[in-house]
């Protein structure tokens, strides 16, 4: 349910059921005869989100402001089946529930015809419990991926239940719809999972 609050603001209530399936190896050393670990996570989620957005583009904006606050409750049942390279030997089942708080702010403090300077920050607080193994836990966590290309990779260093990322967007507009961008970010996980080998 979306509800407009002003010209650039909206409030959204969302309830959904989900069925997530992940096939993965817990090691880099595997052959074509090995079988993957398999984890399913079935459940439901409810969230409330407030967004104020006056950015001029959906991606790679160079003008405007963005503010997002999202609170999400997740409940579900995990079922993990170990593969041939897994240190676990038996199937695992566990109930999970957690709250996820996400805050994101972006503001272009200098906005000229040829030069734009923006500040961008994102913070996540997540009370997610551990899944049956390291990889399954990370796959279920929120990732820090402000660049769309990062969504296509599994980068464990940028997955953490509690983290903050902040950066500076330096943009030179050569002509309309053609920018040269230098985006620099700092990522700080407050809680990070370490794999024990």
PLM regions with names:
Residues 1-35:
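Transmembrane beta-barrel wall of Gram-negative outer-membrane proteins
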Residues 43-175, 179-182, 192-194:
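C-terminal outer-membrane beta-barrel translocator/porin domains of Gram-negative envelope proteins
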Residues 185-186:
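An acidic/polar, Gly/Ser/Thr-rich interaction patch typically located in mid-to-C-terminal regions
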